C-alpha cells in the first residue's frame, strides 16, 4: 500500500532533480550497543532537508515478464515482510526482503510488485546492498554466497563477480555510470575490490598494505569519488581513484552508522542505528537530522538501507516492514546554521 502525505510539498518539489544515478546503498550489521550520541544534550539540528511523503508496504502481484513500465495487476495483494535493501530508478524500485527471501520489483506509480529473483544475501538485522541502472539492470551483494550478481531487467542472471581471497564477504557494491568497473566492498577484509566488466580483479583500495578503513558497511559513488561507510570508525570516508582519502564525513557525529546515500549536489545521507535518525551532511557540516524511533510517518523501526533517486530518498525499514519515501529539498532551500 502506498500512503500519501504532504502531497502539496511533493508537487512543489517534484520538478527538482538531484539524482545521482545510483540505485542505493546499504549497511552491514553493526555490533549491538546502546551508547550515547556524541554531544548528547546539545540542540538537535533543524530538519530543512527531508520531509515524509509516502509509505510503501507492498503492492498488487503482477507479471515479472511484463516490461517494467507496462505492468498490470494480475493477482493478490502482497506485503513486505522484512525489507533490508532498496534501489530506485524512476517509479521502479528493487526491494530485498530477507524474510520472504525474495528480491521484489515494485512499480510505485502503479502500486504493483513482482518477484524479481531469489534473495539469499541478508538475514535478520543485516542490510543489503543493491543498485539498479537506467536499463533496470540490477547488481546485488550476496555475502553468504561470497559474490556479487548482476541481473538483467527480467531477473535473469547476467554475470557473477567473485574473489574469495580478497572479498570473502562482499557486503557493498557500487557501479559507475559508464560501467567500466565494478567495485565491491568486503566486510571481512575492510577493502574495496575493483573488478573489470568480465569479472577479473584489477586492484584493491584501502587494503591490508595501506589500510584506510576499519570496516565497510555501505558505499556509493558521489561527486567527489567513492563514499564508504566505515561503521567501526563511525564515519564516512571519501576515496579517490587510487584509494587515497579525500575527505572524512560525520566524524564525532555518528554512533552506529547504517545505510548511506549521496545526491548530485554532494549531500551525504546516513542512517544512524543509535537513534533511528537520518543525518544529512555537506562535507563536515551536519545540515539536518530527521526521523527517530517509532512507527508513524517519518519514524523508523530499523533503518536498513537508503537509496536516492531524483528528489526522493527511499528508506528500507525492516521492523516496520515498509519502505518510506522522503522528499529531499533542493540545495537552495537549505537553511544555513540549521545544525549546531
Protein language model features and the residues they cover:
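Beta-rich, blade/repeat-based domains predominating
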Residues: 76-89, 121-134, 164-178, 210-224, ...
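Conserved beta-propeller blade signature
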Residues: 93-95, 137-140, 181-184, 226-228, ...
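A short beta-strand motif characteristic of beta-propeller blades
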Residues: 68-76, 112-120, 157-163, 201-209, ...
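N-terminal secretory signal peptides and thylakoid transit peptides that target proteins
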Residues: 1-17
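Blade-level signature of beta-propeller repeat domains, shared across WD40, Kelch, NHL, RCC1
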Residues: 301-340
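Short loop/turn segments immediately following the C-termini of beta-strands
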Residues: 98, 143, 187, 231, ...
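Short loop/turn segments that connect beta-strands within beta-propeller blades
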Residues: 107-111, 152-156, 196-200, 240-244, ...
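Bacterial signal peptide processing site
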Residues: 26-29
Amino acid at each position: 500500500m502506498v500512503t500519501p502525505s504532504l502531497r502539496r510539498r511533493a508537487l512543489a518539489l517534484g520538478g527538482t532533480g538531484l539524482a545521482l544515478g545510483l540505485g542505493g546503498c546499504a549497511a552491514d550489521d553493526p555490533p549491538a550497543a546502546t551508547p550515547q550520541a556524541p554531544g548528547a544534550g546539545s540542540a538537535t539540528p533543524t530538519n530543512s532537508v527531508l520531509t515524509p511523503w509516502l509509505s510503501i508496504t507492498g503492492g498488487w502481484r503482477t507479471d515479472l515478464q511484463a516490461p517494467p513500465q507496462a505492468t498490470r495487476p494480475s493477482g493478490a495483494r502482497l506485503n513486505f515482510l522484512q525489507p533490508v535493501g532498496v534501489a530506485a530508478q524512476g517509479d521502479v524500485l528493487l526491494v530485498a526482503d530477507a524474510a520472504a527471501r525474495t528480491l521484489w520489483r515494485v512499480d510505485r506509480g502503479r502500486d504493483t510488485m513482482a518477484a524479481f529473483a531469489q534473495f539469499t544475501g541478508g538475514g535478520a538485522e543485516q542490510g543489503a546492498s543493491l543498485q539498479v541502472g537506467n536499463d533496470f539492470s540490477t547488481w546485488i551483494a550476496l555475502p553468504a554466497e561470497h559474490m556479487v550478481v548482476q541481473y538483467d531487467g527480467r531477473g535473469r542472471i547476467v554475470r557473477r563477480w567473485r574473489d574469495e581471497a580478497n572479498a570473502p564477504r562482499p557486503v557493498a557494491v557500487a557501479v559507475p555510470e559508464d560501467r567500466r568497473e565494478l567495485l565491491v566492498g568486503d566486510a571481512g577484509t575492510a577493502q574495496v575490490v575493483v573488478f573489470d566488466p568480465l569479472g577479473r580483479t584489477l586492484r584493491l583500495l584501502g587494503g591490508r598494505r595501506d589500510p584506510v578503513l576499519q570496516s565497510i558497511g555501505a558505499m556509493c559513488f558521489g561527486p567527489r569519488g567513492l563514499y564508504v561507510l566505515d561503521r567501526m570508525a563511525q564515519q564516512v570516508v571519501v576515496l579517490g581513484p587510487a584509494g587515497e582519502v579525500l575527505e572524512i564525513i560525520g566524524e564525532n557525529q555518528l554512533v552506529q552508522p547504517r545505510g548511506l546515500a549521496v545526491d548530485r549536489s554532494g549531500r551525504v545521507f546516513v542512517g544512524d542505528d543509535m537513534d533511528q535518525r537520518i543525518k544529512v551532511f555537506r562535507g563536515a557540516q551536519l545540515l539536518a537530522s530527521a526521523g527517530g524511533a517509532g512507527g508513524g510517518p517519518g519514524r523508523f523501526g530499523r533503518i536498513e538501507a537508503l537509496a536516492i533517486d531524483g528528489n526522493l530518498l527511499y528508506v528500507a525499514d525492516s521492523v516496520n516492514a515498509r519502505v518510506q519515501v522522503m522528499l529531499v529539498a533542493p540545495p537552495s532551500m537549505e537553511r544555513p546554521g540549521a545544525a549546531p
